[in-house]
Amino acid sequence: SGCCKHPACGKNRC
C-alpha cells in the first residue's frame, strides 16, 4: 500500500 508516484495510479497518487 501507500502512494504511487506515477499518474496511472489514479487517486492513490502522492
From Swiss-Prot:
GO terms for biological process: negative regulation of signaling receptor activity. Expressed by the venom duct. The keyword Ligase does not apply. It is found in: Secreted. The modification 4-hydroxyproline is found at residue 7. A non-hydroxylated version of this conotoxin has been synthesized. Hydroxylation of Pro-7 seems to increase the inhibition of rodent alpha-1-beta-1-delta-epsilon and alpha-1-beta-1-delta-gamma nAChRs. Keywords: Acetylcholine receptor inhibiting toxin, Hydroxylation, Ion channel impairing toxin, Neurotoxin, Postsynaptic neurotoxin, Secreted, Toxin. GO terms for molecular function: acetylcholine receptor inhibitor activity; ion channel regulator activity; toxin activity. It comes from the Eukaryota. The keyword Secreted applies. Residues 5-7 are annotated as: Lacks the Ser-Xaa-Pro motif that is crucial for potent interaction with nAChR. One of its GO terms (cellular component) is host cell postsynaptic membrane. The cysteine framework is I (CC-C-C). Alpha4/7 pattern. Belongs to the conotoxin A superfamily. Alpha-conotoxins bind to the nicotinic acetylcholine receptors (nAChR) and inhibit them. This toxin inhibits rodent (alpha-1-beta-1-delta-epsilon (CHRNA1-CHRNB1-CHRND-CHRNE)> alpha-1-beta-1-delta-gamma (CHRNA1-CHRNB1-CHRNG-CHRND)) and human (alpha-3-beta-2/CHRNA3-CHRNB2) nAChRs heterologously expressed in Xenopus oocytes, but has minimal effect on human alpha-7/CHRNA7 nAChRs. Has no effect on the frequency of responses from the giant fiber (GF)-dorsal longitudinal and GF-tergo trochanteral muscle pathways in the D.melanogaster GF circuit. This is Alpha-conotoxin PIC. It comes from Conus purpurascens (Purple cone).
